[in-house]
């Protein structure tokens, strides 16, 4: 094989390949708790006031229970979306690696066909130029794909944040905190059963 232009290409290729890291790309399974959230959603939905509890307390509890059920369902949906986006990012990495490996192999095959002379070196210039262009295209495509994924993950994060604002622990005046009734002069507590 010729030395020089091919070596320069391989250095460029190695740097591009390093951008995709080593090892198996992590999929999104670690971020997806949707099965557990959906199970919890079903349990919470089953804990509503039902037909045997009536009145204002029942209505308030039922509304809070419905809201909690909806929040759990939304959290499950967001978890599944996050997993899908992380899976997509892993595929971008895997595809980039495959494509770069293909370009490298194509380059090595082409280099093996030219004579090991100055003329052979000159014959490699357009081949190296094309291979380098393909490396640039692979990197640009991966960056664009990762940017799109990042934007969507940011949107999912914003939805998670908005979802946390939908949770309340109680309906008292304590900013959503449960209130414990205290006796006062105008409202003594009834201690007799």
What are these regions (language model features)?
Residues 28, 32-47, 51, 58-172:
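Amphipathic alpha-helical hairpins/coiled-coils and adjacent low-complexity
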Residues 21, 27, 95, 184-191:
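Short, solvent-exposed coil/turn linker segments
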């Amino acid at each position: 094989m010729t030395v020089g232009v091919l070596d320069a290409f391989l250095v460029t290729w190695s740097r591009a390949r390093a951008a995709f890291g080593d090892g198996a790309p992590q999929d999104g399974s670690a971020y997806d708790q949707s099965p557990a959230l959906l199970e919890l959603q079903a349990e919470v939905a089953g804990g509503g006031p039902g037909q045997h509890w009536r009145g204002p307390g029942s209505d308030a509890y039922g509304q809070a229970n419905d809201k909690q059920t909806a929040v759990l369902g939304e959290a499950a949906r967001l978890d599944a979306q996050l997993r899908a986006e992380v899976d997509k990012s892993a595929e971008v990495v895997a595809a980039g690696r495959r494509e770069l490996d293909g370009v490298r192999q194509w380059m090595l095959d082409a280099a093996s066909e030219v004579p090991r002379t100055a003329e052979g070196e000159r014959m490699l210039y357009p081949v190296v130029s094309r291979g380098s262009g393909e490396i640039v295209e692979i990197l640009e495509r991966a960056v664009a794909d990762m940017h799109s994924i990042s934007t969507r993950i940011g949107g999912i994060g914003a939805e998670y944040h908005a979802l946390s604002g939908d949770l309340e622990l109680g309906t008292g005046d304590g900013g959503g905190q449960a209130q414990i009734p205290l006796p006062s002069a105008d409202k003594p507590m009834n201690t007799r059963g």
